[in-house]
Regions:
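A short C-terminal helix-loop "cap" of Rossmann-like NAD(P)-dependent dehydrogenase/epimerase domains
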Residues: 49-50, 165-168, 192-203
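A glycine/serine/threonine-rich, flexible loop-to-helix segment
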Residues: 47, 133, 184-192
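Glycine/proline-rich active-site loop of Rossmann-fold NAD(P)-dependent oxidoreductases
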Residues: 152, 177-190, 197-199, 203-205
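N-terminal Rossmann-like NAD(P)+-binding domain of SDR-like oxidoreductases, especially those catalyzing
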Residues: 1-177
Length: 205
């Protein structure tokens, strides 16, 4: 099988790519990443020359690039996104472009190319605060930041493409992930480093 992984130079995407290549020896993996500040070029360089991996540097907002990357792929795993809450509050424009326009481009190309499965990586931030009990898959979306709103819009675009174009898609809503190679600005490493340095811990909500 041939699959496309977007955002593969990012934290989760890079781990997923290495895992897939290791555990699916018959598969070919195409990765697409714009290599923004959040993309770690070293993760791409580690896979340079791998016989079953091909890297394309480009934006998910560019339909021509996406179409080239997606050609012949049966599975698309869409990690690419702007993901920092605080940055979205300062400047929401990149979040709207990547998380909404870029996701729409990905979905449109996937529907046209006839992929067998589109996996959209989202976030629990789209759900907002728990009013009562626990979040459910059918619960309302209550985004509380421009980042969360942009990801919620992406989720709704996925639902729309399922209904309108019968695109076989699933949404994965991650919560606070952490591990080696993560950017220090993210919540878990920031909390740990602040605690080690006797600085205030960030509290959201």
């Amino acid at each position: 099988m041939k699959l496309l992984v977007t955002g593969a130079a990012g934290f989760i995407g890079s781990y997923f790519t290495r895992y897939w290549l290791e555990h699916h020896p018959a598969d070919e993996v195409v990765t697409l990443d714009a290599l923004t500040y959040a993309g770690v070029r070293a993760t791409v360089e580690e896979l340079a020359g791998h016989p079953r991996h091909r890297f394309i540097e480009g934006s998910i907002c560019d339909a021509a690039v996406v179409g080239q990357a997606m050609a012949g792929c049966e599975l698309v795993v869409h990690f690419a996104a702007e993901t920092h809450v605080d940055r979205s509050i300062t400047n929401a424009a990149p979040f709207l472009r990547t998380n909404v326009e870029g996701t729409h481009t990905m979905l449109r190309c996937a529907a046209q190319s006839g992929v067998r499965r589109f996996v959209h990586m989202s976030t629990d931030e789209v759900c907002g605060p728990i009013v009562e009990g626990a979040h459910t898959e059918s619960g309302p979306l209550r985004p509380r930041s421009p980042y969360a709103a942009s990801k919620a819009a992406g989720d709704l675009l996925v639902f729309a493409h399922q209904e309108t174009y019968q695109l076989p898609a699933v949404i994965v809503r991650c919560t606070n992930v952490y591990g080696p190679r993560q950017l220090p600005e993210k919540f878990v490493p920031l909390s740990i480093t602040n605690a080690l340095e006797d600085r205030l811990l960030p509290i959201y909500g």
